[in-house]
Amino acid sequence: MLFRNETNLSSNDYIRFGGIKLDFSLCKRIIENISHVIVGKNQSIELLLVALLADGHVLIEDLPGLGKTLLAKSLARSIGGSFRRVQFTPDLLPADITGFNVYNQQTGQFAFQLGPVMTNILLADEINRTIPRTQSSLLESMEERQVTVDGKTYPLPHPFFVMATQNPIELEGTFPLPEAQLDRFLLKIRLGYPEKEEEIAILERFREKDPLIELEAAASPEQVAELQHTRKGIHISHIVQEYITNIVRATRENTSLRLGASPRGSLGLMRAGQALAALREREYVLPDDIKSLVIPVLAHRLILKEEERLRGTSPEHFLEEIINQIPVPAPTG
């Protein structure tokens, strides 16, 4: 599983006994359920659950055919939630996502036609294939959990979780996501090609039947919503908060970066750390939780200076330098 390299800290330094009751077995069941379909992507599955528990959204950047849609469908089935997929194309309109009013000639009134955004799990497939105006139509729903059509506001189901996929920017015909929208995603992950043994296992698993068809729910949307609420009670000490702040501020002070992480990045690290602690069956966040999440939470929020981009340097490179330079807090007492 992901993030097992933890500092041996005393629980007295980080734990707060507040009567928190998390059904940790439920988190494990969801992960195991998804693993019945998805082969060899335990790290990606855990990050997906981190984002879900943190009430965030995920951006997946990878090539076609690596299982992004299958992963989204497996998550939706595992939590017993609804699932919709939107294929983003250059001619896609905002109303194709949010919904629109339709005039009913019999009643003489307008009726709201629900858009695909009215779901628990929304797969925004190849989001960088469409124009910025349509991309931005997701902003309100991702941040506010609601859509506004013709001046009327409609709340979205809870939980509401966006999994957006995008092709690597070097591919032709892409519209890079603006910084404001990138910042709305809690995590960015890559699935990557499977190992040889994993690919053989995929062939064997799908040889006679599709395991997704037989996948049963391991939880309900109501249970997931309760976990999201309870996650907020996971204790994060002042020491860990200061560690988060030091990392984020270092991105702003790095002279090779045109844009560092915003306070939303700090909040994202905190919430992701709480969610990871819950998955690890703890009521408190360790500094190593944060250290393990720095790259997936912050890398997509950083903008390189042009000269660094031309050199082929990645945001991940600078984050690794920052992680190595800033000491991990030691337990006190």
Where are these regions (language model features)?
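Pre-Walker A (pre-P-loop) alpha-helix and adjacent loop at the N terminus of AAA/AAA+ ATPase modules
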Residues: F24-V58, L63
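Short beta-strand-centered segment that lines the nucleotide-binding/catalytic pocket of NTP-utilizing
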Residues: S82-P94, G151-P155
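Walker A/P-loop
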Residues: L53-T89
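C-terminal engagement/docking regions of AAA+ P-loop ATPases
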Residues: E253-G333
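AAA+/SF3 P-loop NTPase mechanochemical coupling elements
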Residues: A111-N120, V149-Q166, L177-L186, R264
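Conserved AAA+ ATPase core "coupling" helix
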Residues: T174-H229
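Conserved AAA+/SF3 P-loop NTPase catalytic/coupling segment centered on the Walker-B
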Residues: M118-E143, P157, E172-Q181, Y193-A201
